[in-house]
């Protein structure tokens, strides 16, 4: 027999088989590939060229001979490309040519589709195949229909026509059945049904075209209604295709073994065969329904619909229908009639050996008879209708036999229920082929309409329930079944929108079916009643259709009708195992639709199926029986699982199991697993309680699994399922609910959709499963490589926001929680919590999905997040601090309710001793990093961490991200913590560039960029807040909470004075670990003890001491340089502190290196340095504590000290240039500490180490680089230099000091202000050095009292007062002075 026209024909033509009239793109030199059509040269008076094609170009109407290599067939793909090209500039006439060829192409396509609709179905199965298949398939179908005489309404409508057409139409129809690989063989198995079909279905009136139309299901359903009549015809058909019939018999026998046994005689004689098969079926179905009843004959599931479709696609004419979806699944199966047979066999194997055999028989019979009826459109139409009718009529048994072969569970169910009538899905599959093509394809799924996407998934779940049958046919069967179900009501529409219509039809059918089911459903046991084995199976994998089938089987055992309907749906979907679930669902829907048109008895059966369909479409929420409900739960669980795995991916896999669907399914599966893990928690909160209660009502051990599935993809369908289950739970025979009007069902579907859209985890997964899976996987992968850098956290935040767009916000949060809980490293926990902070703050600032999803989700998960990120115990103290900072930031920004946050803050503080005031225990941020983190080794630079307020600080740059909280932390342990937290919080906001005052009680300072020098203004007038209040740079957001925290800790550390230095004032925060004793040489070897002290005193008005010892002390000290070290130690110490703050070399009076050294010399111990700085006050206190008492008290406050220290650590803190020497954490902490920490500073300070006598320390003149470096007024510098030059030249440290000076101006200005104009001179000098203010900045942070500008405001007069301290130019000198612990830099003096 000549092969039918193949789908691949157009492609073949493109390769060189172009014929007259074919549209092509011809390439002519100098022009783009031009639209043309193959023409006849004779028409243009040209001699044909055998080696070239004669083409006529569109647009220009020119002609040419073109070589084959330059010609390519015009396809849809080429069309799209051309249209895209036309969007831009094109060659003249090109757009016109494209338009013309597109018009011609569309016309050809329409013509082809019409021809294919009529002829292709015939051709696709090939005449022989069609005939044989028709004979066998018809017989089988008839048998099934007969068995399902109760479903007469199904069989009768189509079968009368089939009868008329008899052999020919049957053959054609069988051909289609064969092509669709529907359950024709299964139908064969049910000979009695086949007879019925034969009698009523072979009406010569029915044309192939009609059948094609009938494929929609309406005509077929009608014919199927007369199933028994068709059986008679079926006999004829069998006779016609003797060989096929025999094969059919063989197949029938196999089917028998599969629970849909129909003796070979069945094939031979429709009635007797039907009876035989009925007997066999009855036996297999546990004889629960007599074979004579033909009601629910356990007819063999004909899982060949999918295979037949494949055959069709192979043949090519049916291919147009199967074209897109069936194409993928079918083509691989077989390419020739023989191949088709094989394919059928293969599919049959999927559904069962029986189906395969049946298909074989059908194929052979079709092959034998196909020649005559290959193009018999009427026969084809009839066959399709017959198939549809058979499918509907035998849908219950169909599923049963499918179960048998495909899965023992369904098989058992079929056995338990005589309703196992062999569905004649073959016709359906053919009908639905087109829809299936669309439906099978992912694209089809989407085009089908929203219903298609979601209901399709739900039917898939249903398919999963009856998964055995749906294997072979699921993909095509889905659409086909949908068509069939619609076919009962509106098969044509179903074809167009198989899934959607299928759902709708199922909904419509369901009411009647539900009513009928109400009778039968009560018999069915709910899953909770089902044997634990069945339930267990179901529980094991709701997705697994076999398990669902088992449940169905059990139910069917109790309610054969319900079971058979369920089985039928399963049988319809007898295609691939992967696509089984989806296909089953579709099949169920189709069956339900067909059952709708079936008689009342059949309706009961179909009602079960319809219920399942409804349940499937509604996520198995509407199952009528408790058994149905159980199945529906299984389906819903499976569906949810499938949906979650791949909302539509599962469906897609069913559609294109051989294509990308598998990949999508894999992604969806992984996603589903994750969802299962976290959705169990989220679903219970998100899904309707009804669903949970339903699960509970069901008594399902797998209800949690279903719930999880529901959370993932059941949110759309599960809520419905929940409702349906709830109803069902109320009464196992919840038929009333299930028999709700189709409108109600549709309403439920709408609800489903709403739920899916509302339930983001579900809706997103279903609508954009692939994109969502990709986003989620990307986010999960980002978590594995997450670091604390702003870039890393920002990237992860963007991925999380993308996930929220797909409804995965709860999943992302759950993933973060699990990651936090499983993370063993505390520093990694902090990284993850910072990510939570970033996501939360970003969402809080956003409108839309992200903002609406993450904030409430994080709020609900806060207890778990905090419990995992900040666990109790000493080891997690840093985590608690950082979490506190984040919480405080949230509190400040009102991300969450204040009451909630305060409760958590209190809990965290109570959880650990250091939670509130453990800053002293804080480690440098780098030490908190992973051991293998290269950033840990980057000493001297601030890491670009999330929440870090400092970037890399290099000597020449100002650190604009100095931590404000450093001072805050210094002020109060708890306050410090809070401040650091606030600062950290601010920093944590990646977008937050503004400087935020961490604590309202602290003075708020505003940093101003003055000549690249940040000045801090004391807004609140509280010097404490100066540093903490504001960040030097907009990079505050950059500053990580970690960094801020370390700063706070450092502040705390800063509090403790060096052992040698006088204790900080009580008001200062608890001292951090004692800094290395900064020898408080109370002006150790100050050559002129009076000189050094006065200059320090003059030069270093105690900035911190302003409270206790305001400018007066500093002013007086400058006037009295003679005072010996003790007085100077007080004043000088203050001066030194000031000097150190200013980093003005007060060499003359002291070996300024000493204190500066102490500050800088103890870089290792930032606290010491701070102490030195504060110690400037404190040190002065040490040596001249009594005189400095007030100053120390004032300066004792860490901030003052910090400020002064800042002068010395300006490089580290304030100035970017010097910060490099300091660790980033130090910068964060305080300028002082940073300077001290700064290795360079420390090394340089080492010269001036307090331990080293000032005399021992190298003397460097302040006037040198420091002053010039800071560009202090020459007079001041000269004064300082003069005053201190002869006493002490500044040692080389001054370079460090210079760096510090660069920063120092920063600090000094702040210190100066804070220092109450004591640092006026110093500030003036600093002011002259805008670049230096960094240091000063660092300082003004520490001394909130001093306005940053104050330092700069200090007049040279102050400097003159400090003339003894001419070292101002060499702020390094002050740093050096700080080297003398006895001389508090800040405490020494304050300009009047």
Curated annotation (Swiss-Prot):
Polar residues: bias regions: 184-194, 391-400, 591-601, 725-744, 1157-1175, 1240-1255, 1265-1284, 1311-1320
Domain CID: 771-912
Gene Ontology molecular function terms on file: DNA-binding transcription factor activity
One Pfam family linked to the record: CID
Matching SMART domains: PWWP, RPR
PROSITE patterns, A to Z: CID, PWWP
Name listed for the protein in its UniProt record: ENHANCER OF AG-4 protein 2
Naturally occurring in which organism (per UniProt): Arabidopsis thaliana (Mouse-ear cress)
Name of the gene encoding the protein in the UniProt record: HUA2
């Amino acid at each position: 027999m000549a092969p039918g026209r193949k789908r691949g024909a157009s492609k073949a033509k493109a390769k060189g088989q172009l014929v007259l009239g074919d549209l092509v793109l011809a390439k002519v030199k100098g022009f783009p590939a031009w639209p043309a059509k193959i023409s006849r040269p004779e028409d243009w008076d040209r001699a044909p060229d055998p080696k070239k094609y004669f083409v006529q170009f569109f647009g220009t109407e020119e002609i040419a001979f073109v070589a084959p290599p330059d010609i390519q067939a015009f396809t849809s793909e080429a069309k799209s490309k051309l249209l895209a090209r036309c969007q831009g500039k094109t060659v003249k006439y090109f757009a016109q040519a494209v338009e013309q060829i597109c018009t011609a192409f569309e016309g050809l396509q329409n013509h082809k589709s019409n021809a294919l609709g009529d002829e292709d179905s015939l051709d696709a199965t090939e005449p022989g195949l069609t005939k044989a298949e028709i004979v066998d398939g018809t017989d089988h179908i008839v048998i099934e229909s007969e068995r399902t005489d109760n479903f007469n309404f199904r069989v009768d409508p189509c079968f009368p026509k089939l009868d008329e057409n008899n052999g020919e139409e049957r053959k054609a129809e069988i051909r289609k059945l064969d092509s669709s690989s529907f359950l024709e063989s299964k139908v064969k198995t049910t000979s009695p049904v086949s007879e019925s079909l034969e009698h009523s279905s072979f009406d010569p009136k029915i044309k192939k075209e009609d059948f094609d139309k009938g494929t929609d299901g309406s005509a077929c359903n009608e014919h199927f209604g007369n199933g028994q009549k068709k059986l008679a015809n079926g006999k004829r058909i069998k006779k016609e295709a003797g060989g096929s019939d025999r094969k059919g018999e063989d197949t029938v026998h196999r089917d028998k073994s599969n629970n849909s046994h129909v003796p070979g005689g069945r094939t031979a004689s429709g009635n007797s065969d039907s009876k035989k098969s009925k007997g066999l079926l009855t036996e297999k179905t546990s004889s629960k329904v007599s074979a004579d009843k033909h009601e629910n004959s356990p007819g063999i599931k004909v899982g060949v619909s999918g295979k037949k479709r494949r055959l069709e696609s192979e043949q090519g004419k049916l291919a147009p229908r199967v074209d897109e979806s069936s194409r993928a699944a079918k083509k691989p199966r077989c390419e020739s009639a023989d191949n088709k047979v094989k394919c059928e066999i293969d599919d049959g194997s999927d559904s069962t050996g029986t189906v395969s055999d049946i298909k074989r028989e059908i194929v052979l019979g079709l092959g034998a008879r196909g020649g005559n009826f290959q193009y018999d459109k009427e026969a084809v139409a009839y066959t399709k209708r017959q198939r549809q009718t058979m499918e509907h009529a035998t849908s219950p048994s169909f599923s049963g036999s499918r179960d048998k072969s495909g899965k023992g569970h369904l098989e058992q169910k079929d056995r338990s229920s005589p309703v196992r009538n062999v569905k004649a899905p073959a016709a359906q599959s053919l009908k639905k082929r087109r829809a299936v093509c669309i439906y099978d394809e992912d694209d089809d799924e989407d085009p089908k309409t929203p219903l298609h996407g979601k209901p399709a998934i739900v039917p898939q779940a249903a398919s999963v329930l009856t998964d055995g049958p749906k294997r072979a046919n699921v993909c095509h069967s889905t659409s086909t079944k949908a068509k069939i179900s619609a076919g009962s009501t509106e098969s044509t529409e179903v074809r167009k929108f198989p899934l959607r219509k299928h759902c709708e039809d199922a909904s419509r059918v369901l009411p009647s079916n539900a009513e009928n089911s109400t009778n039968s459903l009560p018999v069915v046991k709910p899953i909770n009643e089902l044997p634990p084995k069945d339930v267990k199976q179901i529980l094991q994998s709701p997705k697994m259709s076999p398990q669902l089938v088992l449940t169905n089987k059990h139910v069917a055992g109790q309610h054969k009708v319900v079971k058979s309907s369920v089985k039928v749906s399963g049988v319809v979907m007898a295609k691939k195992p992967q696509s089984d679930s989806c296909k089953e669902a579709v099949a169920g829907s189709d069956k339900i639709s067909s059952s709708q048109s079936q008689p009342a008895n059949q309706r009961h059966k179909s009602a079960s199926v319809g219920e399942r369909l409804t349940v499937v479409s509604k996520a198995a929420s509407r199952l009528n029986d408790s058994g149905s409900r159980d199945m529906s739960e299984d389906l819903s669980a499976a569906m949810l699982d499938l949906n979650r795995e791949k909302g539509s991916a599962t469906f897609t896999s069913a559609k294109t199991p051989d294509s990308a669907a598998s990949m999508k399914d894999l992604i969806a599966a992984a996603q589903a697993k994750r969802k299962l893990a976290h959705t169990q928690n989220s679903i219970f909160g998100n899904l309707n309680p009804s669903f949970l209660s339903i699960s509970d009502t069901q008594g399902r051990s797998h209800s949690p699994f279903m719930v999880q599935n529901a959370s993932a993809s059941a949110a759309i369908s599960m809520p419905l399922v929940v409702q349906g289950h709830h109803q069902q739970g109320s009464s196992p025979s919840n038929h009333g609910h299930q028999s709700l009007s189709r409108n109600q069902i549709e309403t439920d579907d709408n609800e489903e959709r709403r739920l899916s859209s509302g339930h983001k985890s579900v809706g997103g997964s279903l609508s954009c499963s692939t994109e969502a899976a990709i986003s989620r996987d990307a986010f999960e992968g980002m978590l594995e490589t997450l670091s604390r850098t702003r870039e890393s956290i920002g990237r992860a935040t963007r991925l999380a926001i993308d996930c929220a767009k797909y409804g995965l916000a709860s999943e992302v949060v759950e993933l973060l929680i699990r990651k936090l809980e499983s993370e063993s490293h505390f520093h990694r926990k902090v990284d993850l919590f910072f990510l939570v902070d970033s996501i939360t703050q970003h969402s809080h600032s956003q409108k839309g999905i992200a903002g609406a999803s993450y904030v409430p989700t994080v709020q609900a998960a806060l207890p778990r997040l905090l419990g995992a990120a900040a666990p109790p115990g000493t080891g997690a103290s840093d985590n608690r601090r950082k979490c506190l900072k984040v919480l405080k930031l949230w509190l400040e920004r009102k991300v969450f309710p204040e009451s909630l946050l305060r409760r958590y803050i209190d809990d965290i503080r109570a959880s650990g001793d250091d939670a509130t005031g453990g800053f002293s225990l804080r480690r440098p941020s780098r030490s908190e990093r992973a051991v293998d983190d290269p950033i840990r080794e980057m000493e001297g630079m601030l890491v670009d961490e999330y929440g870090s307020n400092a970037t890399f600080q290099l000597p020449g740059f100002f650190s604009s991200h100095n931590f404000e909280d450093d001072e805050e932390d210094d002020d109060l342990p708890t306050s410090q913590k809070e401040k650091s937290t606030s600062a950290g919080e601010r920093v944590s906001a990646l977008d937050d560039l503004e400087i935020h005052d961490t604590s309202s009680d602290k003075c708020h300072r505003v940093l101003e960029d003055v000549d690249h020098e940040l000045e801090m203004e004391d807004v609140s007038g509280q010097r404490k807040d100066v540093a903490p209040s504001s960040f030097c740079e907009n990079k505050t957001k950059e500053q990580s909470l970690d960094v801020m925290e370390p700063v706070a800790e450092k502040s705390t550390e800063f509090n403790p004075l060096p052992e040698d230095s006088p204790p900080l004032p009580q008001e200062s925060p608890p001292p951090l670990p004692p800094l290395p004793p900064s020898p408080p040489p109370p002006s150790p070897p100050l050559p002129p003890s009076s000189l050094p002290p006065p200059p320090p005193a003059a030069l270093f008005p105690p900035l911190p001491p302003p409270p206790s010892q305001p400018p007066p002390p500093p002013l007086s000290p400058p006037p009295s340089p003679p005072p010996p070290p003790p007085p100077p130690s007080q004043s000088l110490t203050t001066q030194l502190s000031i000097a150190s703050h200013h980093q003005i070399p007060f060499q003359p009076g002291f070996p300024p290196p000493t204190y500066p050294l102490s500050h800088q010399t103890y870089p290792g111990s930032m606290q010491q340095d701070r102490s030195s700085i504060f110690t400037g006050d404190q040190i002065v206190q040490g040596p001249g504590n009594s005189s400095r008492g007030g100053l120390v008290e004032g300066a004792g406050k860490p901030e003052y000290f910090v400020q002064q220290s800042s002068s010395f650590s300006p490089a580290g803190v304030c100035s970017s240039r010097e910060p490099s020497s300091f660790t980033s954490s130090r910068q964060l902490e305080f300028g002082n500490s940073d300077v001290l920490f700064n290795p360079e500073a420390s090394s340089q300070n080492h010269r001036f180490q307090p331990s080293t006598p000032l005399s021992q320390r190298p003397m460097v003149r302040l006037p040198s680089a420091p002053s010039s470096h800071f560009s202090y007024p020459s007079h001041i510098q000269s004064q300082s230099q003069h005053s201190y030059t002869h006493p002490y030249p500044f040692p080389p440290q001054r370079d460090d000091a210079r760096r510090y000076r660069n920063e120092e101006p920063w600090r000094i200005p702040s210190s100066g202000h804070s220092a109450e104009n004591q640092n006026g001179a110093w500030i003036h000098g600093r002011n002259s050095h805008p670049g230096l203010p960094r240091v000063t900045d660092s300082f003004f942070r520490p001394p909130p009292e001093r306005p940053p500008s104050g330092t700069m405001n200090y007049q040279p007069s102050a400097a003159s007062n400090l003339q003894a301290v001419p070292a101002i130019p060499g702020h390094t000198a002050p740093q050096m002075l700080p080297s003398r612990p006895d001389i508090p830099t800040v405490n020494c003096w304050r300009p009047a």
